[in-house]
Structures are given as C-alpha cells and as structure tokens.
Amino acid sequence: QTTEILLCLSPVEVANLKEGINFFRNKSTGKDYILYKNKSRLRACKNMCKHQGGLFIKDIEDLAGRSVRCTKHNWKLDVSTMKYINPPESFCQDELVVEMDENNRLLLLELNPPNPWDLQPRSPEELAFGEVQITYLTHACMDLKLGDKRMVFDPWLIGPAFARGWWLLHEPPSDWLERLCQADLIYISHLHSDHLSYPTLKKLAGRRPDIPIYVGNTERPVFWNLNQSGVQLTNINIVPFGIWQQVDKNLRFMILMDGVHPEMDTCIIVEYKGHKILNTVDCTRPNGGRLPMKVALMMSDFAGGASGFPMTFSGGKFTEEWKAQFIKTERKKLLNYKAQLVKNLQPRIYCPFAGYFVESHPSDKYIKETNTKNDPNELNNLIKKNSDVITWTPRPGATLDLARMLKDPTDSKGIVEPPEGTKIYKDSWDFEPYLEILNAAVGDEIFLHSSWIKEYFTWAGFKDYNLVVRMIETDEDFNPFPGGYDYLVDFLDLSFPKERPQREHPYEEIHSRVDVIRHVVKNGLLWDELYIGFQTRLQRDPDIYHHLFWNHFQIKLPLMPPNWKSFLMCCEQNEPGILQECTTT
C-alpha cells in the first residue's frame, strides 16, 4: 500500500490547536479534515459524511464539543470516538493516521491499498465500429455487446418491485426476452426487486435455466430467497470482490462492494480490450469512494425517491409543506453529488439510469404526486456545464456505439435512437396477477391465530433494544382493516403488552397495508417491501431514525422463513391461543 500526506500543519498551527474539534482545509487540494484534540491525544478524519459525502459542521446542540453535524441529512459523528450517534449505533468513521515529523510538523496520512483494477493492467486497444454496443432496455437494465459476447445488467422487465409500490416507467423493447436469452452472462447488483426481479427471471428460466448469472459475495446472499421463489435457475456464480473475472481473452469484469451497505450493495467494472465501463448502480459510496478514473463509460443512479422517507411519515414536523421542501432540497443535493462525482472521475461518457420507475397503482396517487424524481437531462446539463464529459440520456431500445462515440461524439451514428413511433413510456400495467399473489396471504390460516405475532417476531430475532412499536393492519387507504391486528411490540424484552410501558422509551407507529404485511410475514421477506415500496405510514416519537431496528428488518432477517407448518400444528394443540395478550381491532 502507499502512504499519502493529506494535510501538513506547521509547528505554530500545532501549538494553536484547541481542545476538542478543529476544522482544517488543504488549500491546494480543497479537501477538508477534522482533528480532535483531547489533551495529548489526537484523532483525525476526513470532513466527509460516510452516508453521502456531506460536509460536517459544528453541532451547536452538543455542549460537550465532541460531535459534528452533516449538512446533508443531519447525521452526527462523535469525533472523540469516531462513531456516528445519529443514526445511533450505526457506522464508524474511517480514521487517518496522525504523525509528527522531525521538524515538529503534524501530518495527516492515509494508507491506500493498491487499486484492484490496476492489477494486470491492459492498455486500451482500438475498437471497430459496432464492436462494443450498449443498449438500454429499462430502469437499470442494459444489454452490452462486447465483441462476440453479450452481457446484461439487472433485468427488471415485467411486474412490480417492492411488493406493489414500483412499476416500470419505460416500455421495454418488445424483444427483451430474446435479448436476455441470448446473453452469455448476467450481472445482478443486489437483492432489491428492481434489480433482482423474480417475475422477469421466471420468464427467462423457462427458456434458459442454465444462463450464467454473476453476483458479489455479499453478507446477505443476493439469491437468498431463490428456493422459495420457485424460479429454476441452475448457474448462479458468487464471486469475490476486487478480483478480475476473465470471460475470454478480451473481456473481464470485477465486482466491488458499496462502502455504506457492503452487506448487500455492489457495483461493477467491465473491461473489454482495455476499455472500462463503470456501473455504480445504487451504491451510496461505491467501493468506499475509490473508483477508476477516466473510464470509457460510467453509468449510475440519479433519480432519488427510492425510500419511504419522508412521504410516508406524518406528525410533528412532517407537514406537506415540509415534505415538499425537503424533497426538493434532497433531489438538488443528489444532483450536485452525482455531478461532482462525475467531474471527479472524468469518464469519457456518462449515462444516468436506474431511476426510471413510477408509483402507478391508483392507490399510490399521493406518493406519485409527492415523490418527485430528478430529471436525467437536468443532471446531464449540470455535468456538461462543469466538464467535457459526454452525456447520454437513454430511451428504451437506444444503442450507444462506444467506438464511434470515443472517436467522434458528434457522429450521428454514435447513438441510434429507437425507430420513430416507438412507445417510450408505459401507460398501462398488469396489476391484477401480482395483487392476487399478495391478497392470497390475507386469508391464510396462519392469521386465524393471534399467536402468529409472537412466532414471527421471535423468528425475526430483534430484541434488547429500547423501542416500542405499534403495528396496525390497514386497508388500501391506510384505515384500520376490519378484523385486522393492532398490537404493540416492546423490543427491549420482546414482549407484547396491551399498553405502552411506563419507562421512558422511543415509540413508532407503523400502519401497513394488510395484503403486503401478511405476505411479508408469511414468506419471511425483508421489510424493504414495506418501506421502500411505500406500503406503510409511519409516526415516531421522538423523531429519530432507529438504524439498528430498520437495518435488522431490512437486511438481517433469517435466511429461512418462519416454520408456519410447525406453528399451525402447535396451534391445534394449544388453542385458543398462545399469545392471549394480543387482540384484534
């Protein structure tokens, strides 16, 4: 590894260090740093939030003078411990090495391992026209022709994502299934259903069950739910991070992890004859922010809106005016962040994708109207204003010829748009088959027994945390579902009281559409189906994001669903119910 000097303080500056937090900027690089002094002990880090790269400022609410606050999302970092305190018990900040040299200057050092993509380097070779072509299908799905090989990214071509909350904005090309079947390999970045689409893969498996699919070796396996899905795929390859995977003499790829969500999120570098294509997909900080520069083509998400926050929240500050202003500000921050990332990495071509979804079900009209997305053209214009990067706003079926674009960006054949009259945006969605699957769970025998609640949350395994949650089953419009369950869960001791405990405790109310929550419970699915899918309405007191709770239910639930067969057998022997304290509304 190499050692890089990030900041050098003179002996006078060292002598003037104050107790507590000190902010510094390297004027030659424009980079910011934080140095914390506690008597003779010094700790240092980059002034960059681990979440989305925001700048820290002094936290005026911290009278002890140990914490800083991010200007993007109000995350807070205790610099004395290098642990984030909002959200509580979440992340740790990467520390820098502090050293004094022989001239009594203070140095902030960063130890950098070698970039894995620089191992076994290949110089770019000249490409023939038509040799490398990238065709956009929809959302995050790209079809790459790389010589005589074809590679597809993240195929979501039919059905919803996140239960019933997301639907495709763009109409995929009519030959999408043929394209998938002709692929030599498929890369699936992570387990979210707008990238890992079981309805799409079921269609593909009916024709090519042995198609090679590659995923990263994440803590939560991408295909953790494959057996339960019923999709017959027989050639799934889990590959280690940061190692070239050779496809043929000209083509290789490398999967990298996300720096914020390494347990589930990945990105990829594809290299053909020395020309790199970087796809950061949904990663918040892909590879911890260390990425190859000056690649031939970079693509990333851009739209925002992939969260239930703040649209699904109410009470306290969550007025419609506050939500609208927050969303507007957040989208602008995301645009600036993506534009700065592109400016820093200097790819030859940049393409915004992986954000083309819509909340099209009539019951989600409020979300659709409130959850505005970024315009890809606005991002591309911002990029072009600050750099010489070529930008491409893709339309379904449009094809980019890499050789032509690298040689002459003005070549009219560099990007071939779909034929005139091609349908670009979807105007109808086949809701019913997918809603029927969800509705089937509502009348399941499991929910005839109130003891399912204790069974489910015991299976989930989250406890010893001071949080009380009220779960309320609702209809389509988030009104209490007739005969539905309304119950409390105290996660400190995993009990199910009739009333909130007397002790001081954080409290959340989660109103969930009955078809989705019961489908999730029955099948042991992750709560992203609820939260990212806009299938809940939430209130919380105090207004704190409980990272441990949500992270557990969104990513750390057991890999196998609850054993409901055994549960029902026990119920037959123990009626009228194991969990007498739970009542129905």
Curated annotation (Swiss-Prot):
Record's keyword terms, sorted: 2Fe-2S, Cytoplasm, Electron transport, Iron, Iron-sulfur, Metal-binding, Oxidoreductase, Transport
InterPro entries: CMP-Neu5Ac_hydroxylase_Rieske, Cnh, RibonucZ/Hydroxyglut_hydro, Rieske_2Fe-2S, Rieske_2Fe-2S_sf
Compartments it resides in: Cytoplasm
Signal peptide: none
Cofactor stoichiometry and binding remark: Binds 1 [2Fe-2S] cluster per subunit.
GO MF entry, a single one: CMP-N-acetylneuraminate monooxygenase activity
Gene3D superfamilies registered for this protein in UniProt: Ribonuclease Z/Hydroxyacylglutathione hydrolase-like, Rieske [2Fe-2S] iron-sulphur domain
Any one GO biological process: N-acetylneuraminate metabolic process
Classification via Pfam families: Lactamase_B_3, Rieske
Reactions this protein catalyses: CMP-N-acetyl-beta-neuraminate + 2 Fe(II)-[cytochrome b5] + O2 + 2 H(+) = CMP-N-glycoloyl-beta-neuraminate + 2 Fe(III)-[cytochrome b5] + H2O
Protein family per UniProt: Belongs to the CMP-Neu5Ac hydroxylase family.
Function of the molecule: Sialic acids are components of carbohydrate chains of glycoconjugates and are involved in cell-cell recognition and cell-pathogen interactions. Catalyzes the conversion of CMP-N-acetylneuraminic acid (CMP-Neu5Ac) into its hydroxylated derivative CMP-N-glycolylneuraminic acid (CMP-Neu5Gc), a sialic acid abundantly expressed at the surface of many cells.
Protein name in UniProt: Cytidine monophosphate-N-acetylneuraminic acid hydroxylase
Organism: Pongo pygmaeus
